[in-house]
Amino acid sequence: MAVDQESFVHLSRPLAPNVLGFGVSNAPLTVNIQPQAVFSIIDHAVRRDDRDTQSTRVIGALVGVRSEDGSEVEVRSTFAIPHTENEDQVEVDVEYQKNMLALTLKANPRETLLGWYTTSHELNSFSALIQNFFASPETGTFPHPAVHLTIGTEAGATIDTKTYISAPVAVSPERAAESCLFIEVPHKLLFTDAERGALGSVAAAADAESRSAPVVSDIENLAQALETVSDLLERVSGFVGEVLDEERDGNHALGQYLMNALSLAPKVSNLAIENDFNNHIQDVLMVSYLANTIRTQIELSQRLATAKLDEGKEGGEKKDGEGAEGDKKTDGQRGQRGQGGKRGGRSGGAGGRGGREQREPREPREAAE
């Protein structure tokens, strides 16, 4: 009688090569991804040139920060890496990757290389080769494991993301460089309330024919947010009602999540909530009024400063013209005075000569006897 036996693969930790002096944490790895990194990857996929490569995917490097124990990483930015790929081989521009990484780390010294991304969910021997390159001590993230992010960029499809780390497997030394086992790790997208609003505006432009959406004011944005919350509450209420009426099966995880959310609600009366909401609205209106007043004052001061500069330039030009004319008149008067003085002096000299009285001739004296 044959006995069914299951096959197992034994993996030894750490996931990176064990070198004296370097230790890797055994804690589970969590990957956090910023929205700008996803947009950068999508932009790279849209702008790829199909004439230079037969590959339908693009690759690039992931840059971000890592926690002290190495159990959590945050992908903040990415940059593309040129590569060519066919059925037989794959070529990566290593020099370009080194130069771009040096420039990126120079601009953001606190960040570091985390791994690489691709726009295909397929994992093959080329993926293992690139993964080992980014995890190597010379050019990679050693002693920490390299993160591999795959993202779907098909037109009209949902953007699906997955993250992996790798572990070495027992293979021959000749194929060690192109062999590894990809292990999927949890990940999540991080975005703030401001980024959520920006993403909502971008999503609203997707359904418009002009592919553009106006930027709404704070009051309109608040009204839209309240409408969204009201719709979500109606959906949750309908779901709970259907579960209570046994029209659909319940979900224990969702029920626990709703219980936790309700427990976080403050235990205050409706009147107090309404008063707080009205106070918040007044604060928002006051901030908006002050912002508009400051903006108007800045524009007015700029216009006044510009007008004063223009008046100063015109006054300076007039003074320069009057000064030049005055200098010319002064020089002319000095010339006339000089000529008159010379003439007067000559006349005076002639008058001096003519003013002498002529002596009468003396009679000869008789000789004394």
Swiss-Prot record:
- Cite a single GO BP annotation: translational initiation
* GO CC, alphabetical: eukaryotic 43S preinitiation complex; eukaryotic 48S preinitiation complex; eukaryotic translation initiation factor 3 complex, eIF3e; eukaryotic translation initiation factor 3 complex, eIF3m
Top-rank lineage group of the source organism? Eukaryota
Task: Please provide the record's keywords in A-Z order.
Answer: Cytoplasm, Initiation factor, Protein biosynthesis
Do you know which Pfam families this protein is assigned to?
A: JAB, MitMem_reg
For region Disordered, the annotated ranges are 309-369
Cite the PANTHER family for this sequence.
EUKARYOTIC TRANSLATION INITIATION FACTOR 3 SUBUNIT F (PTHR10540:SF6), EUKARYOTIC TRANSLATION INITIATION FACTOR 3 SUBUNIT F-RELATED (PTHR10540)
The entry's function note states: Component of the eukaryotic translation initiation factor 3 (eIF-3) complex, which is involved in protein synthesis of a specialized repertoire of mRNAs and, together with other initiation factors, stimulates binding of mRNA and methionyl-tRNAi to the 40S ribosome. The eIF-3 complex specifically targets and initiates translation of a subset of mRNAs involved in cell proliferation.
**HAMAP family, A to Z:** eIF3f
* Similarity comment text for this entry: Belongs to the eIF-3 subunit F family.
Name it: Eukaryotic translation initiation factor 3 subunit F
